[in-house]
Amino acid sequence: MIHADHDDNLPDDEEGLPLPPSKSQRKRDMHALQDLGEQLVALSVDQLKKVPMPEALADAVREAKRMTKHEARRRQMQYVGKLMRHIDPEPIQAQLDVFNGLSKAEIARQHRLERLRSEVLDDEKVLQRIVETWPEADFQQLRTLRRNALKEREQNKPPRAFRELFRVLRDLDVGAAAPPADEPRDDDEE
């Protein structure tokens, strides 16, 4: 009955020292590191250069990217996981989170622009809102693209103007990414 007064939240041995992690926990940790390594291998070369990691790990990841044979790649991924046991994975995970966050933000931005394009096609008054948001926008060009996109849709032609309208909106958004986000806050403060 040694364990009767044992606190399950804080495992200690008889001398009051914390117990080492169980074999199952160590295996879960190793699999997590190996999964992190898989994410590294999936990155592009440019993204990989931005990840803070020791040169030996970077070499192992590059080698794993080159491998095509299943068993060889599996062994290399285990080696990547082994190398990761000796480093702090937090900076690597933080950089991966940044990459994932950026891609999610870009997807959200594209969806927002697609909705705006649909609004333009549904209502010409939206063009005025675009010109107010982005003063550098060419009202006449947007109006022509809208008219051509509607005509293409009506005649079942390829959506050339439809795509061009999206490109123009995307270029406007990239050229002035900060002002549209700031303008509503300025209006609210007045």
Curated annotation (Swiss-Prot):
Residue segments, region Disordered: 1-31
Any GO BP: assembly of large subunit precursor of preribosome
Places the protein is found: Cytoplasm
Annotated GO CC locations: cytosol
UniProt cross-references to InterPro entries, sorted A to Z: DarP (IPR006839), DarP_sf (IPR023153)
Family as reported in the entry's similarity comment: Belongs to the DarP family.
Protein name listed in UniProt: Dual-action ribosomal maturation protein DarP
